[in-house]
Structure formats: C-alpha cells, structure tokens
C-alpha cells in the first residue's frame, strides 16, 4: 500500500511537471491553394452563392442498376457482426434501398435548410447556414460552427439544428438561440476535393475560419466530434481570440502522459483522480481499450496509408460503400452491437437517415477524397505535427458519451484543454452524438455556453 502511494506521488509530480511546462502559443494563420494548377494572380471570387441538392432520373437509374447487380457472400454461421457487416442483414438493407427508399424525397429534406457555396483557397466549399426563425426581443443569435467527421456528413446535424435555432418551439429554454453553420470538409459531400497533397485538419481549420470571417462573424462558438473535434481544436489553436468557446464530443489526445496512466491498473486510477465512472468505462483495460481499438481501427490503417486502393472498389459499388460505412454506425454507436445479427443499426437510426448519408457520398463520388483525409493527417505518423503538442486556451466543454470508441476522462481532457469549464458524463450515446442523441448534445452545448458567457 505504501509503495503504491509513493509511486503514485512520484507519478503525480511527473505529470504536474509535464502539464505545467507548456506555454501558450498559437498556430500560424497562413495561406494555401488547393485548386488545380498554380494559384492565379487574380483575386479569388469571394461571393457566396446559393446551392441546391439535385438529382435526376439518370442518377437514380444508375444506382438501381448497380444495386441489382449486388453479389452477396454468405456469412459464417453465428458470426453476427464480428466479421464486419453481416451479408444476411445487408440483403434487407439493399431491398429497402432498391424498393422503398425515395431519394427524391430525401433531396427535398436536405434542401429544407439553406445551402451555399463559396471559393476558399481554390476550392468550392459547401455549407448550410440556418438562422433562427424567431428571437426574444432585443437578443441576437450566437453563431455556432458545427463540423462533422468520417464517415458522416453535414446531414448528421439535421435533427439538432432546430433544437439550437428554435429551442422554444421544441420545449427548450430560449436563453441561448444559435445561428448554425455546418460546412462540409473539403473532399466530403458537396465540398470540392483538393487537387494537391497535404490538405489536413490545420488547412481545413484555416478554411473554415475564413468561411466564418467571410460570413461576418468575428467571434463565434465551435463544436465537433470525430475529425470535427480536431478541426475545431485547430481553429481554437489558430485564432483563439475569435473563438468564444469550443465544445467537443470526442478528443484527439496525444503527447499526454495522463493517457498512459490506465496501464498502471485500476487501483492507481483511483490515486490519480479518476472517477468511478471513468474506471467503469476504462476497465478491464485490455478489453475496453486495447482490444476494442484493435477491432475498430483496421479501416484507419488502410485509409492512412493507401486510401485510393480501397476507394476504387467503394466508389464503384453502392452496396459495398453502404456496407463499409454502415458497419461504423453499428459498432461505433455501441460496441456490443457486434453481437447482434443486424448490428443494432435500427435501434438508434432509421434506414432512411442512414442511406441518406450514404447517398451524399455516393452521388458526389467523394468516398476516395474523404478517405484521403486520413492519409493527410496520419500518413507521417502521430505526434509529428506541431498542433498535437499544443494546448488550447479557450473556454472548452466536453460531452463524454459512454459508448464512444475510447473514453477520455476529465483528467486527460484538461491537460490538452486547460480552460475546460464543463465536462459531462452523458446518459447514453456513442460516436455519432448529434445524429444519435441530438437532444442530449443540444442540452450540453447550451449548458456549456451558459458557463462560457460568464468567462
């Protein structure tokens, strides 16, 4: 017992030294050109153009012809979702897609919010911009940039947007009313893909900051999960004076000695300040962290090394694309869903919503360019980029959803984000928080903003 206390004290001192030695710094606000060829000498067109999602008979006919040629491989007996997407259940998804899914209707739903495009650093950047339909007298909306990840899209935010822009209508307090901007990451959906290597999270952060500046916002809130959390973190590192607050539902934590402490075992976790909830979500460590990450990260290695190879198959087969993406909406929502024949997909999502997200990738042909984002960010390894070792000095809030792929205790998060003012253990939910639990996430964003406004 005494030896454990001494070791914990020594480790605590090492952590304190490691945490306190970093200085406040910012990422440089540089410039870039990601369009084809050399950057033209003429000034870039900064106009903001309305945009509508469209489809055609030819597009739908081609989709149906490809679906009709789907060739299934029978699953192993009792394999459920342990080998990936179960092809027996995939047949049900394909039948629904071919015979019941109405893409024209979903296009109308996509167009319920105003879409726009604007040129930034040589790329046509797509975004939706939703203003409040009503405001309390004398109040102005709070601008909020929300950034998606992979394999999601701007569509992930469609159910949370009205809770933020029109809270009173949906039974929520109108103390905070938001004006929401949801861009598509370059190379995702309707945002143009880069013609050049190197467009990573930092470049995307700069592009999105320029977007907010072009829209006239000098100070704003930002929110993200998955890649969106890293992009938003980079924005806060780049222009902290323009960010009123940063809210995350996932964190990229590297160069953080605290993230190694669970290896010391559950008893040391208590000495180091982990809560009972942290211990529940981290242990047994081998199963809940090590094995789970090993099971769920195969795609990451492929996409961080040779994304174009697997992309060729996915860009040619809509059913292959659906299986590849929808498998993530199963096990990333709850790892236990791999025990189910249908992967638990319809427990939290409708097939219409899931296939709408797939169609955004399919109709734009952006699965390859979206996968390249892994190569640009991880292709050189981890802990090689400047931003990975930098702290974030803006007010930060964090929603810890219990079924996230890797739980990040408050102790970990606070090392990277010293101004963490709100950390919430969420009641339920996994990786796709806005898509799965929009009300819970909206409530936590509002709670965080209430605290951030007091800073």
From Swiss-Prot:
Pfam families in the cross-refs: EHN
Means of activity regulation: Inhibited by 10-hydroxystearamide and methoxy-arachidonyl fluorophosphate.
Active-site positions on this chain: 226, 374, 431
Positions where N6-acetyllysine occurs in the chain: 439
EC number: 3.3.2.9
SUPFAM superfamilies: alpha/beta-Hydrolases (SSF53474)
Keywords associated with the record: Acetylation, Aromatic hydrocarbons catabolism, Detoxification, Endoplasmic reticulum, Hydrolase, Lipid metabolism, Membrane, Methylation, Microsome, Transmembrane, Transmembrane helix
InterPro entries per the UniProt record, alphabetical: AB_hydrolase_fold, Epox_hydrolase-like, Epoxide_hydro_N, Epoxide_hydrolase
Molecular functions (GO terms): cis-stilbene-oxide hydrolase activity; enzyme binding; epoxide hydrolase activity; oxysterol binding
Keyword Lipid metabolism: yes
Main subcellular localisation: membrane
Entry-linked PANTHER family: EPOXIDE HYDROLASE 1, EPOXIDE HYDROLASE 1-RELATED
Protein name: Epoxide hydrolase 1
Gene name, Swiss-Prot/TrEMBL: Ephx1
């Amino acid at each position: 017992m005494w030896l454990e206390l001494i070791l914990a004290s020594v480790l605590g001192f090492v952590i304190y030294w490691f945490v306190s030695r970093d200085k406040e710094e910012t990422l440089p606000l540089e410039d870039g050109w990601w369009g084809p060829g050399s950057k033209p000498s003429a000034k870039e067109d900064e106009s903001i153009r309305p945009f509508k999602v469209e489809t055609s008979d030819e597009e739908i006919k081609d989709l149906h012809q490809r679906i009709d040629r789907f060739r299934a491989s029978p699953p192993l007996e009792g394999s459920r979702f342990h080998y990936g997407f179960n092809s027996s259940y995939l047949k049900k998804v394909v039948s629904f897609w071919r015979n019941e899914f109405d893409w024209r209707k979903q296009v109308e739903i996509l167009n319920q919010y105003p879409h726009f495009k604007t040129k930034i650093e040589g790329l046509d950047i797509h975004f939706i911009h939703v203003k409040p339909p009503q405001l309390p007298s004398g109040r102005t909306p709070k601008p909020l940039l929300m950034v998606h990840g992979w394999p999601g899209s701007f569509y992930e935010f469609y159910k949370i947007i009205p809770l933020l822009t029109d809270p009173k209508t949906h039974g929520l307090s109108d103390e905070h009313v938001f004006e929401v901007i949801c861009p598509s990451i370059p190379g995702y959906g309707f945002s143009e893909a880069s013609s050049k290597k190197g467009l990573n999270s930092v470049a995307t952060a700069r592009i999105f900051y320029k977007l907010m500046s072009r829209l006239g916002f000098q100070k704003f809130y930002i929110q993200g999960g998955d890649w969106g959390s890293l992009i938003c973190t980079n924005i806060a590192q780049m222009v902290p004076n323009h960010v009123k607050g940063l809210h995350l539902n996932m964190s990229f934590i590297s160069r953080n000695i605290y993230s190694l402490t669970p290896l010391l075992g559950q008893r040391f976790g208590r000495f180091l300040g982990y809560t009972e909830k942290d211990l529940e979500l981290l242990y047994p460590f081998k199963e809940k962290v090590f094995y789970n990450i090993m099971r769920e990260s195969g795609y990451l290695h492929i996409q961080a090394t040779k994304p174009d190879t697997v992309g060729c198959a996915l860009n040619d087969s809509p059913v292959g694309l659906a299986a590849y993406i929808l498998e993530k909406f199963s096990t990333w929502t709850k790892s236990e869903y791999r025990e189910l024949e249908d992967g638990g997909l319809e427990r939290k999502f409708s097939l219409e919503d899931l296939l709408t997200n797939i169609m955004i990738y399919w109709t734009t042909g952006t699965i390859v360019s979206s996968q390249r984002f892994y190569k640009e960010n991880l292709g050189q390894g981890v802990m090689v980029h400047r931003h990975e070792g930098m702290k974030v000095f803006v007010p930060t809030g964090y929603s810890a959803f219990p079924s996230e792929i890797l739980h990040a205790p408050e102790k970990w998060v606070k090392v990277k984000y010293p101004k963490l003012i709100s950390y919430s253990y969420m009641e339920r939910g996994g990786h796709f928080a806005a898509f799965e639990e929009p009300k819970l996430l909206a409530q936590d964003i509002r709670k965080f903003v209430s605290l951030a406004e007091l800073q």
